[in-house]
Amino acid sequence: MYRSHVLVCGGTGCTSSGSQQIMETLKEEIKKAGLEKEVSVVQTGCHGLCALGPIMIVYPDASFYSMVKVEDIPEIVQEHLLKGRVVTRLLYQETVTPAGVKALIDTDFYKKQHRIALRNCGIINPEVIEEYIGTGGYAALGKVLTEMTPDD
């Protein structure tokens, strides 16, 4: 069981801004810090804030980092993942409040949205089909193949 999960956006906007390099560097720095058994790194689909990419979300505290650069990765690993101190200068500013960091879903951009196609973005690993199946993926296909007729 990992104590932290780092989600790196792999959507088109973030990829064009260098998220693949971010992910590679992040994995290297986590290994250097000896955290590979404590911190998982997962590439996700698009979160919808492409202009802020590359973006990264660190759980369990849901810290939302935006416009992350490769040069920022050692600081994120050392400060946030190793010492538990959020790197506030990299946080998406709308998530920063006097009471602390608010969840991304509570920001103006997200709070009126009802995600359908991307509802599992950041919840499941898109590269692990068992996680998709575990959230009901392919249930409609199963119903069509086992319960319905061509006339249905």
Task: Give the label of every model feature segment.
Residues 1-152:
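Feature of Fe-S/electron-transfer and energy-metabolism proteins
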